[in-house]
C-alpha cells in the first residue's frame, strides 16, 4: 500500500482531535468583539452627551474613514455643519476649533464602527476557512454580521432625523433603536462566546433557568427605555428620587397629556422617565429574587454565585442611575450608567447561557 493511500487515514484522526479541542481562539475573539461593542456604546454615549452627533452631515461608509486633512477640507466640513438647524438654533457663533472637537467625537464613533467591522469579518472568514466553526455557530455569526451592517444604516437614519428642518437633536425613538440594536448584537456575541466548550454544570431547577433567561430580556428592555430617556432628555427633568414632582407616580393626566396617547411613551418626558424607573425596580426585584432562589436551591454552586454577582451589579447600576438623575446627568455619570448597563446585560446573558448547558 502506498504512502498516498495511507495519508487520508492518518489525517482524519488528527482532524477529529482538532475539532474536539476547546475553541479557545474563537471564544476569545468573540469576547474581544463584545468588548469593542461596549467601547462603541461608550463613545456613542460621549458623542451624544457632548452634542457632537450631528457634526458630520453625510454618510460615506468608505471615503468617510479619512478625516479632513487640510484647512480647505475643514472649512468645507464646517460650512456643511453651519447649514444645519442645530448650528443655527444652538451653536451659532461656534468657532472652527470648537467644531473640530465635536467632529472628532462623531468621526471617532464612526471610525470605531468601521474597525469593529474589520475585526469581525476578517477573523470570521479565517475561522470558517480553517474549520473552527460548525454550521450552527457560523450561521449565528453571519446573522450578527448582518445586524452589524444594519446597525450602520440605522445609525445614519438616526443622524438624518436630527438634520431635518427645526431639529436640534436626533429622534428619540431612532436613538433608542440604535442603542437597542447595539445591545442586542453585544448580547449575541456574549451568548455565543459563553456557549463555547463550557464545562456543563448540574442542572438547576427549571424555574431558575427560566428566570435566568428572563433577566437579559428585561435588561434589554430597560436599555431600550434608557435610550428613550436619553433621546428625549428626560433625565434632565424630575431630578428627585424616589418621588417625581412630589408623587411616586405623577397624575395620569400629565402622563398622557399628548394625543394620540401612544406618542406619550416616546415624547412625554414624565412617562418616559417613569417607565424607566418602574422597569428598573422590577429588574432589581427579579435579580434579587433570582439570587435568593438560586442560593436556596443550589447553595454554593456556580449558578448561585453568578446569580448573586448579577444581583449585586444590578443594585449598583440602580444606585448609579439614581445618582445620575439627582446630578442632572453629568458626562461621567451618564457614561458610567450606560457602560454599566452593558455589563449587566453581558453578565445576565452569560449566566443564562451557561444555565442552558447544564446537565439534566
UniProtKB/Swiss-Prot annotation:
Sorted UniProt keywords: Cell membrane, Heme biosynthesis, Iron, Membrane, Metal-binding, Oxidoreductase, Transmembrane, Transmembrane helix
GO CC terms: plasma membrane
Membrane topology: Multi-pass membrane protein
Annotated heme binding sites: 276, 337
E.C. number(s) listed in UniProt: 1.17.99.9
Cystine pairings recorded for this chain: none
Domain of life: Bacteria
GO biological process terms on file: heme A biosynthetic process
Compartment list: Cell membrane
Chief localisation class: membrane
Listed transmembrane segments: 29-49, 111-131, 139-159, 175-195, 210-230, 269-289, 309-329, 330-350
Pathway where it operates: Porphyrin-containing compound metabolism; heme A biosynthesis; heme A from heme O: step 1/1
Database matches in PANTHER family: CYTOCHROME C OXIDASE ASSEMBLY PROTEIN COX15 (PTHR23289), CYTOCHROME C OXIDASE ASSEMBLY PROTEIN COX15 HOMOLOG (PTHR23289:SF2)
Summary of subunit composition and partner proteins: Interacts with CtaB.
Function: Catalyzes the conversion of heme O to heme A by two successive hydroxylations of the methyl group at C8. The first hydroxylation forms heme I, the second hydroxylation results in an unstable dihydroxymethyl group, which spontaneously dehydrates, resulting in the formyl group of heme A.
Protein name, per record: Heme A synthase
Organism: Methylobacterium sp. (strain 4-46)
Amino acid at each position: 500500500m502506498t504512502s498516498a493511500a495511507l495519508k487520508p487515514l492518518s489525517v482524519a484522526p488528527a482532524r477529529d482531535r482538532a475539532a474536539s479541542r476547546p475553541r479557545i481562539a474563537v471564544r476569545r475573539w468573540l469576547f474581544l468583539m463584545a468588548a469593542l461593542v461596549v467601547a462603541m456604546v461608550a463613545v456613542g454615549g460621549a458623542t451624544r452627551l457632548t452634542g457632537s452627533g450631528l457634526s458630520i452631515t453625510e454618510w460615506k461608509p468608505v471615503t468617510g474613514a479619512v478625516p479632513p486633512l487640510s484647512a480647505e477640507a475643514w472649512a468645507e466640513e464646517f460650512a456643511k455643519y453651519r447649514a444645519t438647524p442645530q448650528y443655527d438654533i444652538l451653536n451659532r457663533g461656534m468657532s472652527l476649533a470648537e467644531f473640530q472637537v465635536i467632529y472628532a467625537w462623531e468621526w471617532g464613533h464612526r471610525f470605531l464602527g468601521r474597525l469593529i467591522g474589520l475585526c469581525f469579518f476578517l477573523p470570521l472568514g479565517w475561522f470558517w476557512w480553517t474549520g473552527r466553526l460548525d454550521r450552527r455557530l457560523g450561521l449565528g455569526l453571519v446573522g450578527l454580521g448582518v445586524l452589524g451592517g444594519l446597525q450602520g444604516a440605522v445609525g445614519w437614519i438616526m443622524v438624518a432625523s436630527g438634520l431635518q428642518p427645526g431639529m436640534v437633536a436626533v429622534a428619540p425613538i431612532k436613538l433608542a433603536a440604535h442603542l437597542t440594536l447595539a445591545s442586542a448584537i453585544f448580547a449575541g456575541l456574549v451568548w455565543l462566546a459563553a456557549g463555547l466548550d463550557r464545562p456543563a454544570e448540574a442542572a438547576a431547577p427549571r424555574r431558575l433557568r427560566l428566570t435566568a433567561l428572563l433577566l437579559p430580556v428585561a435588561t434589554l428592555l430597560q436599555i431600550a427605555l434608557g435610550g428613550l430617556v436619553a433621546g428625549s432628555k428626560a433625565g434632565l427633568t424630575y431630578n428627585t428620587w424616589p418621588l417625581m414632582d412630589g408623587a411616586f407616580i405623577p397624575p395620569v393626566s400629565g402622563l398622557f397629556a399628548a394625543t394620540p396617547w401612544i406618542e406619550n411613551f416616546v415624547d412625554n418626558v414624565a412617562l418616559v422617565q417613569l417607565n424607566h424607573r418602574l422597569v428598573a425596580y422590577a429588574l432589581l426585584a427579579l435579580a434579587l429574587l433570582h439570587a435568593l432562589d438560586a442560593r436556596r436551591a443550589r447553595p454554593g454552586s456556580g449558578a448561585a454565585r453568578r446569580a448573586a454577582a448579577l444581583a449585586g451589579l444590578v443594585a449598583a447600576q440602580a444606585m448609579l442611575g439614581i445618582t445620575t438623575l439627582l446630578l442632572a446627568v453629568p458626562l461621567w455619570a451618564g457614561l458610567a450608567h450606560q457602560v454599566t448597563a452593558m455589563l449587566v446585560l453581558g453578565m445576565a446573558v452569560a449566566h443564562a447561557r451557561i444555565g442552558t448547558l447544564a446537565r439534566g
